[in-house]
Amino acid sequence: MSDVVSKDRKALFDSAVSFLKDESIKDAPLLKKIEFLKSKGLTEKEIEIAMKEPKKDGIVGDEVSKKIGSTENRASQDMYLYEAMPPTLPHRDWKDYFVMATATAGLLYGAYEVTRRYVIPNILPEAKSKLEGDKKEIDDQFSKIDTVLNAIEAEQAEFRKKESETLKELSDTIAELKQALVQTTRSREKIEDEFRIVKLEVVNMQNTIDKFVSDNDGMQELNNIQKEMESLKSLMNNRMESGNAQDNRLFSISPNGIPGIDTIPSASEILAKMGMQEESDKEKENGSDANKDDNAVPAWKKAREQTIDSNASIPEWQKNTAANEISVPDWQNGQVEDSIP
């Protein structure tokens, strides 16, 4: 045993033997004991010798040797197991190797990049030309960024200006619209007021016209009567002026009992009898005042008055009297001639 175990490992070996001889771990699984001894740094050969020390019989030694061989081959089984064996390790295929290779490559690439970027520049500084080139490239990038930012700022300023102009135009339009609505409302109210005033004036004018027409119906009839009387009087005056004294005497002594022309009353007498003399005088005064201002009389009224004047009717009995010669008997003519000196 002294040949197998060296002097520097003698203490470790003796502790392993004393561990195996302990009664508290006597019933422990053999594999657990072997794993524990391996964890302490003993070799397989030293473990085998240590296992033989507590038990000098050959059965235990053969059993220990078999267990050690099963650990190396990972295929043999223990003949004296006190509990179930742990499951065997799964068999590795190409996927496991691929994953391991990928992970290894990633780690190696990461280490390479770290070394290239940080370790090597600190150990071996780069040349000034390369540093200047990198600096220039960085400056170019910053210049591009500044240009883009300036363009964006200009676009934003123009957009804000357009928006402000649009808002101003919209505000002006709204103000104009409000003013137009106010003016429209005022105009509508003014038109409504004027319409009411015109309506009232039209109603008043209509009432005035109706009243005037109703008042002038009797006046028109009176004017017609007055004109007929004036025409009768003028005709009689004409007859009287054109006749001679002989005719006047003949008419006055007519044996037929027909009254003479002198017995016919004048228009003033007739009106006095009818109680209308004052009204006729007023109408004459009104007619004289109207003649002073002919321009104030409408054309239709002038035409109507002319028609009435031109068509002044003369009674038929007057026309017949004027047209027919008054027949005087011969004996009356003789008497008249004898009476004339």
UniProtKB/Swiss-Prot annotation:
GO terms for cellular component: peroxisomal importomer complex; peroxisomal membrane; transmembrane transporter complex. Residues 279-295 have a biased composition (Basic and acidic residues). Pfam families: Pex14_N (PF04695). Keywords: Acetylation, Membrane, Peroxisome, Phosphoprotein, Protein transport, Translocation, Transport. It comes from the Eukaryota. Present with 2570 molecules/cell in log phase SD medium. Component of the PEX13-PEX14 docking complex, a translocon channel that specifically mediates the import of peroxisomal cargo proteins bound to PEX5 or PEX21 receptors. The PEX13-PEX14 docking complex forms a large import pore which can be opened to a diameter of about 9 nm. Mechanistically, PEX5 (or PEX21) receptor along with cargo proteins associates with the PEX14 subunit of the PEX13-PEX14 docking complex in the cytosol, leading to the insertion of the receptor into the organelle membrane with the concomitant translocation of the cargo into the peroxisome matrix. This is Peroxisomal membrane protein PEX14. It comes from Saccharomyces cerevisiae (strain ATCC 204508 / S288c).
